Amino acid sequence: MASRKGENSEMEEIESEKNGSVVGIWRTLDASANRSAEAVRVLEDILRFCLNDAFLSREAKAIRHELAVIFAREDLQARIRLRDVLRDVGVSSKVAKTPPRTEMRHVFAANAARASQSIRSLEECSRLVVPAVTASFEQLRYRIYSLEKAAMTIITSQNKLADISLCVLLDVDQPQTEFKMLVAKLLAAGVKMIQLRD
């Protein structure tokens, strides 16, 4: 019962703010927590099931679990108690047009941006009500940036190699004129990748 009493006094203190700015901060933390967890889950799924990258999918999973540990902290539970979806003015607003996501890289990039932006919001708002977690959010945001860079490098490389059905290995130890003629013939025949060997 003492816990319930403490919870009620915390809520009264939060709700007694004249302009509701503290309530707004908690609601921002709640929305950003949900957004970041959802986005990181999408990143993890793409890394695991589309790229089959064990290392990067483990990193995404670790980030997601670290976020969950932070969100479970007792000093962050006011965000859930102050959740008010029915009066959220942004629930019914729609953007005019979302850019088309026709490839997996578009989905990955959009969710990496969503994750880093929402974690940045968590970082900034937590400074005002639970500064003890701010540094953790900052560190996680930088890890998202690194994860995005590594994954996009892999995705770009895979896209470049997707069209290549034949790779020709050429020995460079031959006269230069013959070598140039052979390369020209291979390119004219549609070869898209040539590897040079000594």
Model-derived regions: residue spans:
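Structural preference for solvent-exposed beta-strand-turn elements
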Residues: 6, 10-34, 38-158
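Conserved N-terminal beta1-alpha1 strand-loop-helix module at the mouth
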Residues: 146-198
